[in-house]
Amino acid sequence: MAELAGLLARAITAEPVDEVEDPTRTRILDAALDEAAAVGLARMTVEDVVRRSGLGRMTVYRRFAKRDDVVDALVVRECRRFLAVVAEGLGEGDTPEDATAAAFVAAMGFARTHPLLRRVADTDPGAVLATAAARDRQVLTLGRDFIAAQIAGSRPEADARAVRRTADLIARLFLTYVAVPPDDPDPRDDAHLRAFARDLLVPVIAAGSGLG
C-alpha cells in the first residue's frame, strides 16, 4: 500500500475515475469496502474481495493485480467521496457561517456512517489519532491545507498564517471527534452539530483569520 499521505494527495489532485464507465471496477471496490469493514483493512485479501464481489477471479485480477492496488484504489475513492460531501456542504450555505456549519455537519455525518471509518474508530481509535501524532504529519498537513483553502476562499483578506493555524486546529478537532466521539455535541444529531459549529467553530474561524 502506498503511503496514506500520497493517496490523499492523489484524491485531492488527480483526475477522478468515471465509475459509470467501469461498473465492474465499482463493484470490486464496493466489495472491498464491505470486506474491509467486516474484517479490517489489514486482514482483507484479494480472494476475499473476489468472493464478496461475485465476479470471476481473473476479472478482479485484470483490474487489480495485487492487494495493495485494491487498497490504494479504495482509499483514494473514499477520500474523494469525503471531499465531495464536504464540498457539497460548503455549497449549501448562503453565508460563510452557514457554509462552515453545513460542511462540519457533512464531514461528521460521513465519518459517522462510513463503515470502514466506524470500524477503525470502534476497534482501533488510536489508528485515527496516529495520523495527527505521526512524525511527518503529512496526512494532518493535507487536511489542514484543504481546510485552509476553504477558509481563504470565503475570506480572501484573511491573514494566511492565522488561517493555517485555525485550519490546523479544526483538522485536529475533527480527527479527535472521529476517533473519540464526544457526548456534547451529539455526533448522531445534525442539529446539535450545526449549533456547535455556529456557536464555536464559526467564531474560532473568524477570530483566527483576523476578521472576528
Regions found by a protein language model. Give the residues of each.
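Amphipathic alpha-helical packing segments from all-alpha helical-bundle domains
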Residues: 83, 128-157, 161-168
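Amphipathic C-terminal alpha-helical segment
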Residues: 109-113, 149, 168-187, 199-210
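Basic, helix-initiating cap at the start of DNA-binding domains
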Residues: 1-39, 43-52, 69
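Short hydrophobic/aromatic patch on the recognition helix
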Residues: 55-64
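Helical hydrophobic small-molecule/effector-binding pocket
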Residues: 88, 98-122, 131-141
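Alpha-helical structural segments
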Residues: 23-34, 38, 52, 69-91, ...
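Residue-level preference for short helical/loop micro-motifs built around acidic side chains
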Residues: 42-43, 68-69, 98, 119, ...
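Intrinsic, short, N-terminal disordered tails of RNA polymerase sigma-factor systems
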Residues: 1-19, 109, 131-133, 137, ...
